[in-house]
């Protein structure tokens, strides 16, 4: 089982049709942007101030889990500033010349968006430093003894960097961003508003409780919410009257094996293995990998993060431990003979 099989994974690659739909329903202004109230308020002030001064917005770093709207926010920044957005990603910029070509084509105050900025090569990153600080491009012409450095002046611009792994950014790069924003998982209320708005833009008939139920199963992530909405739309069209209500959502997502808290078959299999085969743990990663027939990297990077974040498991020095939430979720009896680690965990 791999992550691309999971409908509730924010990392799952989207089809061309899904990308077209996502662009159509993506908010274009801060007024349309639901959730992230602190980020929205701060960016509104920073953008208004920059526009009043006729300056480029400070370089902005946006980080957080996948699917929370980093690309959407970069588009909104460009729209609100009334400038063009040029998009690229860290892995694409292999050589200094790749970045130089982008930078020299920017107009005044334009926004350059680099997704996965933590994956920039060191050579490209070095070129970026003077561009961010002094709006200058420092490049070498020629080779050997005849090589010389030339400086190219750049128009003022805004670099917006996005990453899911801010800890992998080098300090020199991170320190050059004047604005740093962290996107948090969305509340169910905010997600239900996003689902309702998307449904209306797609001309779908949806009830309030239908939108709320999709939101509850979306793991706090708009990308997942919009994907589930599209799948429920298909179910409502074929098996119902076309109206997306609570009953239709429940039947559609049950068919897709997405439970009321957003867990799928991989989450269920992991938790039940931990509780039923290993009495709740502690269990080492190697043992879980063998029991599930999954790669260790898949378990650590795909399955466990959401379970840990929601408090269903804990990682300890001795291994993985199921929490009281996990036992309650599956209505399982807590074993009588628990380890000291488990007793402490379940009493929290």
From Swiss-Prot:
PANTHER family xrefs: HOLLIDAY JUNCTION BRANCH MIGRATION COMPLEX SUBUNIT RUVB, PTHR42848
Binding site for Mg(2+): 71
Chain positions covered by the region annotation Large ATPase domain (RuvB-L): 4-186
Region (Small ATPAse domain (RuvB-S)): 187-257
GO molecular function: ATP binding; ATP hydrolysis activity; four-way junction DNA binding; four-way junction helicase activity
E.C. numbers: 3.6.4.-
Region (Head domain (RuvB-H)): 260-348
Function, in words: The RuvA-RuvB-RuvC complex processes Holliday junction (HJ) DNA during genetic recombination and DNA repair, while the RuvA-RuvB complex plays an important role in the rescue of blocked DNA replication forks via replication fork reversal (RFR). RuvA specifically binds to HJ cruciform DNA, conferring on it an open structure. The RuvB hexamer acts as an ATP-dependent pump, pulling dsDNA into and through the RuvAB complex. RuvB forms 2 homohexamers on either side of HJ DNA bound by 1 or 2 RuvA tetramers; 4 subunits per hexamer contact DNA at a time.
GO biological process terms on file: DNA recombination; DNA repair
Positions with a binding annotation for DNA: 315, 320
Reaction equations catalysed: ATP + H2O = ADP + phosphate + H(+)
Quaternary organization: Homohexamer. Forms an RuvA(8)-RuvB(12)-Holliday junction (HJ) complex. HJ DNA is sandwiched between 2 RuvA tetramers; dsDNA enters through RuvA and exits via RuvB. An RuvB hexamer assembles on each DNA strand where it exits the tetramer. Each RuvB hexamer is contacted by two RuvA subunits (via domain III) on 2 adjacent RuvB subunits; this complex drives branch migration. In the full resolvosome a probable DNA-RuvA(4)-RuvB(12)-RuvC(2) complex forms which resolves the HJ.
Keyword ATP-binding listed: yes
Domain notes: Has 3 domains, the large (RuvB-L) and small ATPase (RuvB-S) domains and the C-terminal head (RuvB-H) domain. The head domain binds DNA, while the ATPase domains jointly bind ATP, ADP or are empty depending on the state of the subunit in the translocation cycle. During a single DNA translocation step the structure of each domain remains the same, but their relative positions change.
Major site of localization recorded for this protein: cytoplasm
Keyword Cytoplasm: yes
Keywords for this protein: ATP-binding, Cytoplasm, DNA damage, DNA recombination, DNA repair, DNA-binding, Hydrolase, Nucleotide-binding
Protein's name in the database: Holliday junction branch migration complex subunit RuvB
Family: Belongs to the RuvB family.
UniProt source species: Francisella tularensis subsp. mediasiatica (strain FSC147)
A GO CC annotation given for this chain: cytoplasm
Subcellular location: Cytoplasm
């Amino acid at each position: 089982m791999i992550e691309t099989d999971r409908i509730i994974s924010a990392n799952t690659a989207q089809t061309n049709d899904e990308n077209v739909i996502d662009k159509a329903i993506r908010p274009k202004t801060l007024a349309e942007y639901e959730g992230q109230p602190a980020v929205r308020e701060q960016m509104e002030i920073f953008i208004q101030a920059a526009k009043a001064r006729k300056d480029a917005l400070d370089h902005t770093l946006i980080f957080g889990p996948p699917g929370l709207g980093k690309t959407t926010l970069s588009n909104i920044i460009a729209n609100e500033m009334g400038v063009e957005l040029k998009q690229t990603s860290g892995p694409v910029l292999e050589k200094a010349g790749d970045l130089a070509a982008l930078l020299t084509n920017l107009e005044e105050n334009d926004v350059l968006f680099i997704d996965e900025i933590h994956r920039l090569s060191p050579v490209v990153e070095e070129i970026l430093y003077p561009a961010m600080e002094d709006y200058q491009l420092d490049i070498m012409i020629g080779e050997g003894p005849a090589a010389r450095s030339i400086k190219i002046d750049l128009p003022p611009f805004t670099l917006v960097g996005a990453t899911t792994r801010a800890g992998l950014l080098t300090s020199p790069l991170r320190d050059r961003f004047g604005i740093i924003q962290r996107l948090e998982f969305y509340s169910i209320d905010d997600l239900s508003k996003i689902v309702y708005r998307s449904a209306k833009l797609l001309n779908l008939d949806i009830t309030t409780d239908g939108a709320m139920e999709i939101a509850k199963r979306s793991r706090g992530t708009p990308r997942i919410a919009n994907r589930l909405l599209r799948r429920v739309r298909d179910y409502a069209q074929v098996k119902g009257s076309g109206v997306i209500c609570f009953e239709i959502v429940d039947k559609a997502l049950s068919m897709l094996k997405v439970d009321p808290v957003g867990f799928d078959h991989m989450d269920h299999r992991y938790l039940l293995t931990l509780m039923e085969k290993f009495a709740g743990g502690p269990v080492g990663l190697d043992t879980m990998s063998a029991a599930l027939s999954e790669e260790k990297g898949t378990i650590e990077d795909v399955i466990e993060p959401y379970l840990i974040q929601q408090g269903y498991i804990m990682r300890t020095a001795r291994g993985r431990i199921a929490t009281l939430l996990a036992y309650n979720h599956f209505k399982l009896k807590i074993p009588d003979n628990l380890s000291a680690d488990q007793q402490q965990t379940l009493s929290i």
